[in-house]
Structure formats: C-alpha cells, structure tokens
C-alpha cells in the first residue's frame, strides 16, 4: 500500500522556531501518516531535542523521532535548550540549507512534493540569502519563470474550498500600481486556469478578479487602472469565465457565506487578488489555522502553512499544527491528482 503513496519532503523550517514542534505534532496524526511517505529534511538532533523538551513540558501528541525518516539537511545546526525561540544567523542558514536540499532531491525525482515549515526572512538576509521568501528560492532553483502563490483552505463548516491567487506578493503597497500590468495579470490568469485544470480537475473555471481601487475605481473617479485596461482585459480573456473587476470590499461576501454554509451564494472556483493584503486578510480571517500556501508553476508540488516561525511560542508545547497538517494533506492529494493528470495526457498522445 505504501508504494502507492506519494513521496513528500517535509522541511523543518527555522529550527529555533515552532517548525520542529509542529512537524512532530503533524506526524503524530493518523490521517497524515496514512496520506504519504514523508521524509523530514533537517537535523535528527533537532527533532530529538524538541521531542525531549516538549515531553518534559507535558506534551503527548508527538511523533517519536526514532520512527521518522530524516534526510540530514547538511547545515550542522545543533539545537540546545538555550537556542529554542532565539532565531539567529545559524538557524536562518540552517533553514535555507533544508529547503535547498529538499529542492535538489525533488528535482532528482526523489520526492513528488515539498512541504515547508516556516522560516524567518530577515534571518535569511542576515545569513547572506537575500530572497523575499521560500517561494522565490523554489522558483529560481527549479528554473520556473512563471509561478504564483495560491492560498487554499477547506471549510470545516460547509466543506467548500476557497482558492485565492495573488497577482503581486511581497512588495511595498506603493509599488503595486507600478508592478501591475496587463501582461502580468494575463500571465497570472493563465497560470491559475492551467493549475485549476491540472491539479483540481476544474475544466471550465469561473474566476473572480478584484479591482485595484476602492469600488473598483468607480468609473475612473477613484482610480484609472480598471477603466484604462483591467476591465477590457478581463472582458476579452478567452480561457475562463471571468467576474470582475469587482469592488474589493464586497467581493469577499459570497466566499464568507459559502465558508460558513449560509445560503447558496454564487461563488467562483478561484479568486485573483491584486496585492498581498487584499487577498490574505480575508483568507486569514476565515481560515487562519487551515489555510495552505500552494506554489503554482513548479515542476513538483509545494505547500506550506500560512503562518510564521512564532519564536515567542517555540518550545512551550502550545503551537498549533493544524495548518501544517492541512499543507501535508493537500500536497499528498495534489501529488496524486497531478500524477493522474500526467498519465491521462500521455495516454491521449
């Protein structure tokens, strides 16, 4: 049976943060254990030290490190009790080494997907790795020029799944109008449509797109982008049914109703937000513990929990692993569906 399960790499993230704790908690979950063959990329000593510390503090919902397959990340990081919750240059460098190792092994075909625990971007920068985040490293090392961050969460209330793609990500708000172009939005729509078909089996998707300005520009009174190019681009886009540009404040009403199972609102298969907070504020309000970051456009599946390192919580036994569990389950599900889609395409040729 295990031979049929997808093989996933699970990085430890920053070893001084909550990454090791939520990895141990996630791997103790029977549903996670049954969904994939999981190899942790990091230091076994970090897992063992975290396990001992948390057991001393009364935690019981932990996987035993002795039974966890580990691929040593090559950083040589050693976790002492005094380093827990105190991220530094060494822990930042270690988290980068774990990710790099996982990517290299995935490109060699050893893993069908990567699940990444949280890292601290500022510690990467201090360690000499000036990347905006893990997504950009994944794209560069895999040679992926067109990629995107899709946030996915399934409602525990209704079973409905929200999918939100960001057109722009980690840039200052002042740069958003300068970065948004017809070419960029069209490329993001193409990426989203292709991914909905390949990964989620949605052949004819409906996509809702937010406007950039309040009230989607109010016919040019509150901003020109919608009037001068965005509305026309969406009207003529040929590969999916598009709703928009929609007023950003009211676009999220129907998804919220669907999330909580209120009535039968008209919802899209996916939503395109034009900048970071426009998409992630509603996602985190609805699904902070369940949202998963799915990177589109890579040659393998990559997911991550939608939260940070939480150094202030590390080692206390209180970190919640639900988002990481959801990231693992989604990676396993999509690895299987992606493989099935590839086999179907090959059979048609």
Curated annotation (Swiss-Prot):
A cellular-component GO term for this protein: cytoplasm
Annotated metabolic or biological route of this protein: Cofactor biosynthesis; pyridoxine 5'-phosphate biosynthesis; pyridoxine 5'-phosphate from D-erythrose 4-phosphate: step 4/5
Biological process terms in GO annotation: pyridoxal phosphate biosynthetic process; pyridoxine biosynthetic process
UniProt cofactor note: Binds 1 divalent metal cation per subunit.
Keyword list, A-Z: Cytoplasm, Metal-binding, NAD, NADP, Oxidoreductase, Pyridoxine biosynthesis
Enzyme Commission numbers on file: 1.1.1.262
Residue numbers binding substrate: 135, 284, 293, 302
Record bears the keyword Secreted: no
Chain sites annotated for binding a divalent metal cation: 170, 215, 276
Cofactor requirement: a divalent metal cation
Gene Ontology terms for molecular function: 4-hydroxythreonine-4-phosphate dehydrogenase activity; metal ion binding; NAD binding
Subcellular location per the Swiss-Prot or TrEMBL entry: Cytoplasm
Note from the entry: The active site is located at the dimer interface.
Protein name per the record: 4-hydroxythreonine-4-phosphate dehydrogenase
Record organism: Synechococcus sp. (strain JA-3-3Ab) (Cyanobacteria bacterium Yellowstone A-Prime)
């Amino acid at each position: 049976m295990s031979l049929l399960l997808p093989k996933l790499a699970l990085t430890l993230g920053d070893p001084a943060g909550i990454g090791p704790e939520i990895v141990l908690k996630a791997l103790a979950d029977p549903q996670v254990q049954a969904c994939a063959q999981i190899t942790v990329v990091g230091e076994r000593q970090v897992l063992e030290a975290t396990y001992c510390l948390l057991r001393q503090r009364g935690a019981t919902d932990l996987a035993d490190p002795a039974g966890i397959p580990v691929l040593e990340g090559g950083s040589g990081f050693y976790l002492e009790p005094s380093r827990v919750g105190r991220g530094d240059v060494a822990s930042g460098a270690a988290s980068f080494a774990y990710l790099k190792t996982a990517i290299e092994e995935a490109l060699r075909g050893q893993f069908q997907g990567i699940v990444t625990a949280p890292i601290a971007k500022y510690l990467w920068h201090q360690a000499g790795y000036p990347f905006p985040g893990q997504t950009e490293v994944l794209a560069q090392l895999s040679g992926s020029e067109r990629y995107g961050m899709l946030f996915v969460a399934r409602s525990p209330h209704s079973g409905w799944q929200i999918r939100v793609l960001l057109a722009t990500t980690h840039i200052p708000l002042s740069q958003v109008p300068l970065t948004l172009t017809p070419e960029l939005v069209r490329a993001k729509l193409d990426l989203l449509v292709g991914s909905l078909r390949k990964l989620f089996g949605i052949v004819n998707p409906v996509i809702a797109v937010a406007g950039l300005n309040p009230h989607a520009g109010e016919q040019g009174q509150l901003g020109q982008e919608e009037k001068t190019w965005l509305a026309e681009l969406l009207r003529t886009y040929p590969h999916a049914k598009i709703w928009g540009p929609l007023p950003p404040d009211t676009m999220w009403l129907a998804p919220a109703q669907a999330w909580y199972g209120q009535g039968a609102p008209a919802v899209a298969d996916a939503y395109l937000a034009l900048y970071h907070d426009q998409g992630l504020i509603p996602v985190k309000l609805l699904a902070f513990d369940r949202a998963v970051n799915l990177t589109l456009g890579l040659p393998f599946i990559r997911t991550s929990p939608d939260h940070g390192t939480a150094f202030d919580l590390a080692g206390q036994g209180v970190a919640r692993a639900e988002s990481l569990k959801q990231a693992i389950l989604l990676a396993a599900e999509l690895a299987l569906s992606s493989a099935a889609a590839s086999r179907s395409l090959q059979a048609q040729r």
